[in-house]
Amino acid sequence: MSEALQPPRRARRVFVGRPMTSGQLEDELLPIPLALPIFAADAISSVAYATEAAMVVLLGAGLAELHVALPLSIAVAVLMAIVIASYRQTVRAYETSGGAYIVARENLGTLPSLVAAAALLVDYVLTVAVSVSSGVLAITSAVTSLDHYNTELSLGAVLLITVVNLRGVRESGFTFAFPTYLFIISMLVAVGTGVFKCATSTCPRAVTPHPLAAGAGALGIFLLLKAFASGASALTGVEAIANGVNAFKHPQAKNAARTLGVLALVAITLFVGVSYLAVRTHARPSSTVSVVSQVARAVFPAGSAASWMFWVVQIFTFAVLILAANTSFQGFPRLSALLAHDRFIARQFTNLGDRLVFSNGVVVLAGAAALLIWIYHANVNNLIHLYVVGVFTAFTLSQAGMVRYWLRTHGDGWRWRAPINGVGALATFVVMVVVVVTKFTEGAWMVIVAVPLMIVGFYGVRRHYVRVARRLEAGAAAVVAAPPARNTTIVIVESLDPALDRALWLARGISPAGFRALHVPLPGSDPGIRPRWFHHVGGEPMLEVLDGGLGLAEAVLEQVWRLPRGESDFVTVVLPELFESESLLSQARNARELALKFRLLSEPGVIVADVPTVRGRLGAAPQRLLVRVLVSGVNAASMRAVNYATALDVADTRAVHFAFSSQEARAIHVDWSSHAPRIPLEVDEAPYRDIGGPLLRYLHALTVDEDAVVLVLMPELVTRGLRRALHNQRALYIKRLLLFEPRVILASVPYQLLR
């Protein structure tokens, strides 16, 4: 592999760890003690801000109304119990994934399932932003000198969680279990101590620095509903366990249901306990210190023997709030992978990374959350208004889907199970309506607008993928049945240098009957190249000098347009490039060549063979040419590349496929045999789901003899605009990988999807 590309790979190994094989996926499954901190940290940690969120709203009616926070919290706790009971049934019915998207898709249809998916994706991003910002607030509440760095600290926390999650599910579980359990213990101690003091003597009184101003309004039904909606943020995170059933150890459904039960017990106890103490200690919302911090300081006052417990509570509140974001880092990538599998978003989201996690989903979630934190300056009170809409939309659709499931299947106990899910659907629907009405003008409108826009995008992506799949499948037979292909080769000549010598050798190898040499006189090119050309090549072919006024790309295209092109007529443009060093930046400096390659890529029947050569690293003169076609399957794009390979008439020509599993290897062997393409197929396994390493090892085995050069032909789908992001990520990776690989030349065989 090129030295220019080694440092990023080494850095990835340091931060992410050694890659794991697909066969190790079973080892990554989680027991309940590890699953709880991974999937339930969000719901458990919400005790740190849900009570305060309700109190901020109640403050609008004056200080005297803050006591209403306790009955509101009890109502939220009842709602949480209903939702968790409903989800315990859901995970038993859908043992691989009981998330809202799957349940709604199977029982309510495509549109409701996409509404649930879009709402959840938005909510997962908001969960990261709110949790991390709340965690940083817990620290700056204790160390007030840091309160000017909330945004920077929050962004750093997002980066840390991202790296940990890229290292794998099980490793993140071990990392996050310790602080999560210590938070639960410290909060139980704080709640127990506070309740004991209130029951046996006078309740301690909280001190509130920089309190928020109290309003003078009346405590009407609208304000009560708004406060209830804010407190309902305590329910966020419950969905993640249902989405992640397949991450549990077997029996998966049973273990997921047990984890939900533990979550209900812990979260309800802590939430109601904190609300009780917040009311009894007269804590009130502050611009600098959280309500939980005030309660902890009141229960463990400075100077007392237990004052150190205040710092324990603060430190682990910070830790669990930061780690609560991890719930989204489990849910978002899994949901994205399901959507990608159904072709509603880019297929890259289905790719497992080195550590058997959906790495693309992890990175996208981190980027979106970081952007929100930066825009809102890590202000929890501003972010919280965007919260909850998405999760309660998903709750409602999931529970409604389960009602339909029981009525449709009549499974065991359906007569009493359906009403449980029905009550859950009704309760969460009421909360969703309340949230939309009460928080619409404060930011919820953005979520309401974002969800339909996302759904439009989902349908657009699916239409594109379905059309491409149909075209590739239908076109495969026509490509295979095409008559024997012919090839015309053109070599672009800028100067007489070692890169040109390699290009001429390749042109003679793929067009022994002759080829054309074109020179476009441009600023910086060799003005005296024509008389020296004859002696350099021994007379043939003649150098054709084009009109330099058109520019390189237009002059070459004008010649290409004059040649026959089609399924059986190809034009190969060989482009020599001489570099001073193995640097990706050095290629970017060749703007004219890049523009030419980009223009030629959209021309039907035109193949660009890029021949990069590093000055001073030439090696032995090549003697043998081998052709290898990288194929993804039996489709029109791969078969066109095979047709082109046969037109080159190189004796040692083969197709190569890198399979991520033995099942995939068997499947492509069967497909290849049934379609009987004109060249043999070799299949190599890539157990780490990255074809880079296996591809390099395969090529190194061929080029171990320095007289051999391998021409790698790579099918590449060509489309326009934003659709480019839906294709060819692997092709771009291979281009970077092989750019400076010794004795390897890469040529793209385009398949146009421009309409």
Predicted regions span which residues?
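Cytosolic C-terminal regulatory domains/tails of membrane transporters and channels
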Residues: 1-24, 469, 473-477, 482-755
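Hydrophobic alpha-helical segments and their helix-loop junctions in multi-pass secondary transporters
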Residues: 183-210, 275-282, 398-411, 460-469
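Extracellular/periplasmic helix-exit of transmembrane alpha-helices
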Residues: 195-202, 258-295
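Membrane-interface "cap" regions at the ends of multi-pass membrane proteins
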Residues: 1-53, 85, 96, 104-106, ...
